Design a protein with these regions (language model features):
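Short S/T/G/P-rich N-terminal loop/turn motif that feeds into the first structured element of a domain
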Residues: 1-56, 67-73, 89-208
Length: 208
């Protein structure tokens, strides 16, 4: 995996396999690990299970650019796994992709670049923590989207929330108590689609 100082691209892939098909999905995940490890541009990846629905999974990835992500879409084994998932194993999925605008770890803020205009619904905050974060910690500035815990580490949580607007996102990112989280990241979502509504998906030649 490579590291870049450029603005990062976040990908959130939420998937619900058909009943009895979870292991098929996880088998494909294992087969793709060696490909991902050697693929240029992947900065970070972790997988989670929904806290209140153990059939729903999340793959959260950080890429160094849209170009690198596009190259991964064209990987042969990735395309085979994707086709099998869509045709046989997935009941539904949702993909959200966007540029990371800000990242806060402990008391340090980095990668801040708010000189953009975004629709309220196009912003997404991911909050990584070592435990469940109560709704009261963010309800003034955002609404809860979903909560996941680590697939291989039950003490790794990620909470996805939708800020009311950019000002609320700024306030939450800068003021949440550092006792509650390990990292907060703000993304401007440019593509958001599900299995049956792919208006914002790449063309058939460039599936995600």
């Amino acid at each position: 995996m490579s590291v870049s100082n450029k603005a990062l691209i976040g990908l959130f892939f939420e998937v619900v396999p058909y009943s009895g098909h979870l292991n098929h999905y996880l088998n494909y995940v294992e087969k793709l690990k060696p490909e991902l490890e050697k693929h240029k541009g992947l900065i970070w990846l972790n997988r989670y299970r929904a806290l209140f629905d153990d059939q729903c999974l999340l793959s959260h990835q950080l890429w160094d650019s849209e170009k690198s992500l596009g190259h991964w879409r064209q990987n042969k084994l990735h395309r085979i796994a994707q086709k099998a998932g869509i045709e046989k194993h997935f009941k539904d999925y949702r993909i959200r992709i966007g540029e990371r605008l800000a990242c806060r770890q402990a008391d340090m803020v980095t990668d801040v670049s708010f000189e953009i205009t975004s629709k309220p619904g196009a912003l997404l905050l991911s909050i990584q923590s070592g435990g469940f974060i109560p709704n009261t910690a963010f309800s003034k500035h955002a609404s809860l989207d979903s909560v996941y815990c680590g697939l291989s580490a039950s003490d790794q949580f990620i909470t996805l929330v939708t800020p009311n607007n950019l000002s609320s996102a700024l306030a939450l990112t800068s003021t949440m108590s550092s006792d509650l989280f390990a990292k907060i990241e703000l993304f401007s979502i440019s593509r958001n689609y599900i299995m049956t509504e792919r208006d914002q998906a790449p063309s058939a030649k460039h599936h995600e």
